[in-house]
Amino acid sequence: MAADEHGGETGDAAAEGIRAEPKGTAPTPLSVLDLVTVGAGRTATDALRTSVTLAKQAESRGYHRHWVAEHHSMPGVASSSPAVILAHLAAHTTRIRLGSGGVMLPNHAPLVIAEQFGTLEALAPGRVDLGLGRAPGTDGATAAALRRSDQLNEGADDFPQQLAELTRFLDDDFPDGHPYARIHAVPGPVQSTSPGGVQSPHRPPIWLLGSSGFSARLAGMLGLPFAFAHHFSAQNTLPALDLYRDTFRPSAVLDAPYALIGVSALATDDENEARRQVMAAALNMVRLRTGRPGLVPTPEEAEAHQFTEMERDFITSWNSNVIHGTADQVRSGLDDLAKRTGADELMLTANAHSGDIRLRSYELVADAYGLPNPA
């Protein structure tokens, strides 16, 4: 297939991996954002096993995607290497789309990302998404260690150039005379054109992720799908989505905008239990924001914590954007959010100390919307 400058392959194959139809009574397709959270008293092994169970459960219940986020130097988040985790999830699933939500492009050489996601596409043909962000996903010192440079703005400032380079590697179409013209990302298209080669898998669709206007504008100008981090930047959601739609230019990938929003949502069997779990997750966020990252505390630890006035103000603001409660309450909140934003897809992240609580939340939401239940 032909390729455009940034969007990649043309035709229906690219769009098929992006657009989806709602299931049950859900207002949009529903998907999963997995931070691979590690609770106090638990290990990274426990968290990764929960992720496998969650991916299998999400697939069976009709969730459309399972994305893994990239974060570094955070004891309570075990998703420092999305590509490795996604390869493991691919071995345990057969239909659900798997992707990065996202890979932080400035932290990596574009060629390495092209090779990693070419490998993932070879492992799970036709169901891999490449979500890209420009934030470091960590603090400044860790970002410097990842990039082997103390010029922290260097990667973010030339994000459009990095994106163009990554796309060239994915499509194997550097122009003649370019320094990288003889370099090929493998697995990739070069294998199709080599002697004895056969058609290689379609390369993963690129998504741009963001929490402000920069990525919204860039995604619109390039005609790419856009994923907005409503779960930690709710005040910017509507302006960013408006900007994306206003600047959108039809491309080889999409003929109309497609906007996904990440939503923090936790459903439990009991409303009070939801409040307890959300408070514990909020305490974890307070500690992260004040330079004291740790494992996600238990609800009991959060109840015993002596909150300062500043911490209480932060938590009140933070929790106001977490949709939580019983399944009916969460369904109502998601319906309202979809209506207010016009989002094409909702991606839910359930942050809690316990993996069982997280798994139960996705089950309850699926039940509330009448999603498929093979049991």
Show the residue positions of the predicted features.
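N-terminal beta1-alpha1-beta2 module of alpha/beta enzyme domains
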Residues: 1-98
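An alpha-helical appendage that flanks or caps ligand/catalytic pockets
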Residues: 2-5, 14-24, 152-188, 236-342, ...
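Acidic (Asp/Glu)-rich catalytic clusters
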Residues: 22-25, 59, 86-94, 117, ...
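Flexible, glycine-rich active-site loops centered on histidine and acidic residues
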Residues: 25-44, 106-174, 226
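Conserved, mostly hydrophobic/aromatic
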Residues: 30, 58, 62, 70, ...
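Hydrophobic faces of well-ordered beta-strands that scaffold small-molecule active sites
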Residues: 30-34, 66-68, 98-100, 128-132, ...
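Active-site mouth loops of central-metabolism enzymes
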Residues: 34-49, 103-111, 200-210, 318-327
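A conserved active-site cap/scaffold subdomain adjacent to cofactor or substrate pockets
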Residues: 212-235, 240-241
